[in-house]
């Protein structure tokens, strides 16, 4: 089901004045259409939004506010957007969406939703964020994946940027933008040949030309407790013991290694291990 995710325009929802709380941010869908993906474990997880909305975020301290101002020109995020793709592993939010009036779409709107979701599914950000692993963990009831949220926004002033809430990350809240490398056709061909050569040698596995660029971090912070103290994320396990068997082989002294790790589970009802 995860590998076959596709838009379901016949099940689209009409949304207006709908507010989604994701970590410290507010995502307001003022007016538009929300097209769900085909379901995973009985419910959709990824959504395409087309319409008018805005995302609001106040950084938790002066350092993060200064970082945000460096990239956006403001110490607070108040960014309108017309299009977005969401990954929502928040059951209460998905249930609230399901109670909205349905508004099936076809024609150009359906084509736009399909193009947006396909671009997101094929893009590097989804792979970097390990979205498929988070969707799988949520589908099997892993408590750490239940609060995962990702929004890929097309801001009216800031262009395309990401906002992520990942309970498994050390700093669970990330806001930023991937700036692709500006390559000429010649440089792109050269980069592709270099990557392919390295991959034949077992290096740079999984890297694509589209991955080349820089990630600009606008805000990166942990959840804040009621007394304003930072609370770091958890992957649900902690290593107790490592065993490493390593050897250098051949004239090129290639390193071969086997690693065994003993893990201690620190979260109840953990279903998956991302280590």
What is each residue range found by the language model?
Residues 1-256:
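N-terminal, polar/Ser/Thr-rich
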Residues 260-275:
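Surface-exposed beta-strand/loop patches in extracellular or lumenal glycoproteins
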């Amino acid at each position: 089901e995860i590998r076959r995710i596709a838009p379901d325009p016949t099940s689209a929802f009409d949304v207006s004045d709908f507010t989604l709380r994701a970590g410290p941010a507010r995502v307001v869908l003022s007016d538009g259409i929300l097209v769900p993906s085909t379901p995973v474990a009985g419910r959709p997880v990824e959504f395409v939004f087309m319409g008018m909305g805005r995302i609001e975020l106040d950084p938790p301290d002066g350092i993060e506010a200064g970082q945000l101002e460096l990239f956006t020109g403001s110490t607070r995020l108040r960014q309108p957007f017309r299009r977005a793709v969401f990954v929502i592993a928040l059951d209460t939010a998905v249930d609230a969406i399901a109670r909205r009036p349905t508004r099936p779409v076809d024609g150009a709107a359906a084509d736009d939703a399909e193009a947006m979701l396909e671009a997101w599914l094929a893009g590097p950000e989804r792979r970097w964020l390990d979205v498929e692993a988070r969707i799988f963990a949520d589908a099997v009831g892993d408590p750490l994946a239940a609060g995962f949220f990702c929004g890929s926004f097309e801001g009216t002033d800031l262009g395309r940027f990401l906002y992520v809430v990942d309970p498994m990350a050390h700093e669970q809240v990330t806001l930023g933008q991937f700036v692709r490398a500006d390559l000429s056709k010649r440089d792109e061909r050269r980069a592709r040949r270099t990557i392919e050569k390295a991959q034949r040698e077992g290096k740079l596995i999984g890297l694509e030309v589209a991955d080349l660029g820089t990630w600009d971090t606008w805000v990166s912070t942990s959840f804040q407790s009621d007394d304003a103290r930072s609370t770091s994320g958890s992957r649900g396990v902690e290593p107790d013991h490592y065993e490493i068997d390593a050897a250098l082989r051949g004239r090129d002294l290639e390193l071969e290694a086997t690693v065994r790790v003993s893990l201690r589970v620190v979260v109840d009802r953990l279903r998956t291990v991302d280590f």
